[in-house]
Amino acid sequence: MKVSEFDYELPPELIAQEPVEPRDASRLMVLHRKTQRIEHRIFREIIEYLEPGDLLVLNVSKVIPARLYARKKTGASIEILLIERLEEGIWKCLVRPGQKVKKGTELVIDEDLSAVCLGRGEDGTRILKFQPQDDRLIFEKGRTPLPPYIKNEVPLERYQTVYAKEEGSVAAPTAGLHFTPELIEKLKKKGVQFAEVVLHVGIGTFRPVKVEEVEKHKMHEEFYQVPKETVRKLRETRERGNRIVAVGTTTVRTLETIARLPEQEEYVGKTDLFIYPPFEFKLVDALVTNFHLPRSTLLMLVAAFAGKDFVMEAYREAVKRRYRFFSFGDAMLIL
């Protein structure tokens, strides 16, 4: 399958530059897979599509202030993006321009914080050891790691879901940005159940698909965790005959990863599961997601779930109706 099959025309002004206030006032496109029908709603109306006993599964990973600006002793500017914590104060990072940072290169962030390069990781990453080795201090100096298509500085809390709690992502699991505490409360009152997983969104989010054949693309590994209580709730939802509704593509990848493993009480590991058409979904019955970049692995996942032709038609409709796209954009519910 060709990557070009997942391309579409997007006027740049439809790329959302800031989030909607309140969060649940964004638009919601509802896709009915069985009837191939499309509806246009407001996100808070999602409650009308969920039944008592349905299970909403949230990725509670929290975005870290992963972007840092440093200088070499020569005065050259270097941008650092924290990717993965190896131990306290030692991180796998992306650095730009990379060719200027070799083993032994010292980087000064400010008078309180510096780093030295211990060597190269795979994928052109660098291993940096910070001085002092204090993650709290590193996070204090860091900024929101916004995607390159967002031009404005946005406070970290608006690039964070209201339920985020496990630090480790370098990009937000954006489908969750539409939920407010009030909407969650209303859903609970209706009898909708909630469960949590963790998948720390990693470097793959910033990396475009560079191959022409979809099947040749390799995903980066990302850490995930599914606690005992969630495993129990997933099983009980299945037994009741209710739906498992994944909030976000990261949640889908976590659930479909564990669906392919031997049964366990809880799950912790790394996944590089790449979902593209055709794909047999074993756990996920419905999906809440955003509008994704052309040719992206996220769009391929959505196409695998709802059917490529139907999804590409829905995207053309979204452009026509001036939906807002990408991280701060509108949402889609696929039933």
UniProtKB/Swiss-Prot annotation:
Pathway assignment: tRNA modification; tRNA-queuosine biosynthesis
Species in which this protein is naturally found: Thermotoga maritima (strain ATCC 43589 / DSM 3109 / JCM 10099 / NBRC 100826 / MSB8)
Name of the protein in question: S-adenosylmethionine:tRNA ribosyltransferase-isomerase
Function in brief: Transfers and isomerizes the ribose moiety from AdoMet to the 7-aminomethyl group of 7-deazaguanine (preQ1-tRNA) to give epoxyqueuosine (oQ-tRNA).
UniProt KW keywords: Cytoplasm, Queuosine biosynthesis, S-adenosyl-L-methionine, Transferase
Cellular compartments annotated: Cytoplasm
GO molecular function: S-adenosylmethionine:tRNA ribosyltransferase-isomerase activity
Assigned EC number: 2.4.99.17
GO cellular component: cytoplasm
Any GO BP: queuosine biosynthetic process
Enzyme class: transferase
Source taxonomy: Bacteria, Thermotogati, Thermotogota, Thermotogae, Thermotogales
Similarity comment text for this entry: Belongs to the QueA family.
A UniProt-annotated Pfam family: Queuosine_synth
Self-association state and partner proteins as the record states: Monomer.
Recorded catalytic activity of this chain's protein: 7-aminomethyl-7-carbaguanosine(34) in tRNA + S-adenosyl-L-methionine = epoxyqueuosine(34) in tRNA + adenine + L-methionine + 2 H(+)
